[in-house]
Curated annotation (Swiss-Prot):
Name of this protein: WD repeat and FYVE domain-containing protein 2
Domain of life according to the entry: Eukaryota
Binding locations of Zn(2+) 2: C319, C322, C349, C352
One Gene Ontology term, aspect cellular component: early endosome
One MF term in the entry's GO annotations: zinc ion binding
Described purpose of this protein according to its UniProt entry: Plays a role in coelomocyte endocytosis.
Organism (species): Caenorhabditis briggsae
SUPFAM superfamilies xref list: FYVE/PHD zinc finger, WD40 repeat-like
Keyword Repeat attached: yes
Entry keyword set: Endocytosis, Metal-binding, Repeat, WD repeat, Zinc, Zinc-finger
Gene name in the database record: wdfy-2
ZnF start-end (FYVE-type): 286-357
């Protein structure tokens, strides 16, 4: 029987206390999957892009309900949106690789097409606008990143990846692009020309979402491998910290830099709020061995040792806290370990379990994240941190607006990584 370390932490409050997101509004009416949502900060409104080819702007009316103020149909399904509240310009990326720009009326009752670009040969997977340099960025499943001048519409640069682009964030001069192979490419744009800085590789499946904390210079990547990785770009040490709290594909991420929080959501409807103002520990690399590193029993592929000892080979496991390659008998303990990002129970070896039991004061198991079940898979999410509002779209085609002020303002744990 597997041993459970410190069962009491299941009922304990997190480092942020007992705060939870509060549902404020539901917006129904879509007949197809919602691919993107944007929450306005200056007005009470939500942009949506749907597989039914529609781009809609919902505004809050006097009766406290949201109704579509703009309902525009695109030639094909829109895949992503970017909206500038300063310029009232809306960018719409389509499944056929085109990007449209619209001027939105200041009364939010209409939008007028101003131009379009045939940028890519595949679906648009990311859009961005750098106001300071007047550049519009787009990336696509066709493996390319392209940037145009917003003043004259001319293409000024491009870059080709080895895999399909799946997500992008911009903080010039840097551009971060996630791809289908699980890599994050870091580019520096100098005089409109791309320079490869590095390729971040740790995920085992495609990147689904990226978000950037400009205050701490930290990049977060979410993936189909259920994992979130925090890349400390500004630290200069190449440190990366794993966040394990999802049991399905992570679909979208939103950083709250001022509150030092990270919001993540997955395909099963689990919404997580992570405390990023705590000291975290890097996960160890998994060690390789042909025999259990605790009892020396051979693993099932070690045929020579199995034949010599006349024993049946064992399945290999790894201790999540020390990385040792061990057999099932030597790794029969389960525990959370939030400082290493493990918010759900993971397997650890008997030695690590013994140390935790003997010295519980050295292993703080207080949860460092708040889970919240939405009960429908999340397809898109957007945060307005200054308002303390979060918007999500679900697989049930319902848009939800959440009050997350209590989560963002809750006291955190000890600072630092």
């Amino acid at each position: 029987m597997a041993a459970i370390i410190n069962q009491r932490v299941d009922q304990g409050e997190s480092s942020m206390g007992g705060a939870k997101p509060t549902l404020l509004h539901k917006i129904a009416g879509h007949v197809a999957r919602i691919n993107d949502v944007i929450l306005l900060s200056k007005d009470e409104g939500v942009w949506t892009a749907s597989d039914d080819r529609s781009v809609r702007l919902y505004l809050k009316r006097d009766n406290d309900q949201f109704w579509p103020s703009i309902h525009h149909f695109m030639p094909v399904a829109p895949t992503c949106l970017f909206y500038s509240e300063e310029t009232y310009k809306l960018l719409v990326g389509l499944i056929n690789g085109n990007v449209y720009e619209f001027n939105v009326a200041d009364d939010f009752n209409s939008m007028t097409e101003s131009r379009k670009w045939t940028c890519h040969a595949g679906p648009i997977s990311g859009l961005g606008f750098a106001l300071s340099s007047e550049l519009i960025f787009s990336c696509s499943r066709d493996k390319s990143i392209v940037w145009h001048c917003s003043e004259n519409s001319n293409k000024v640069g491009s870059y080709l990846l080895e895999n399909s682009c799946t997500a992008m964030v911009i903080d010039l001069p840097f551009v971060f692009v996630g791809d289908h192979g699980g890599h994050v490419t870091v580019l520096r744009i100098i005089d409109n020309q791309p320079n490869l800085v590095s390729k971040l590789s740790a995920h085992t499946n495609s990147i689904t979402s990226l978000t950037w904390d400009g205050n701490k210079k930290v990049l977060y990547s979410g993936s189909s491998d259920h994992l979130i990785i925090m890349w400390d770009i500004g630290g200069g040490k190449g440190e990366a910290y794993e966040l394990n709290g999802h049991n399905g594909k992570v679909t979208t991420l939103c950083a709250a830099p001022a509150a030092k929080r990270l919001f993540s959501a997955d395909e099963h409807g689990k919404l997580m709020c992570w405390d990023m103002d705590v000291r975290r520990v890097e996960t160890p690399e998994w060690k390789t061995s042909d025999c259990c590193q605790k009892c020396n029993q051979p693993f099932f592929w070690n045929l020579q040792a199995m034949w010599q000892r006349k024993v049946v080979g064992l399945r290999q496991h790894h201790c999540r806290t020390c990385g040792s390659a061990v057999c099932g008998s030597c790794c029969d303990n389960w525990t959370t370990y939030p400082p290493m990002g493990y918010e759900t129970k993971v397997r650890i070896c008997n030695d690590c379990a013994g140390r935790m039991k003997e010295n519980p004061g050295n292993f703080d198991l207080t949860p460092l994240a708040i889970p919240h079940e939405i009960r429908t898979g999340i397809t898109a999410m957007h945060l307005q941190e200054t308002l303390g509002l979060l918007v999500t779209s679900g697989q049930n085609r319902v848009v939800m607006i959440w009050d997350v002020r209590s989560v963002c303002s809750a006291p955190s744990g000890s600072g630092g990584h």
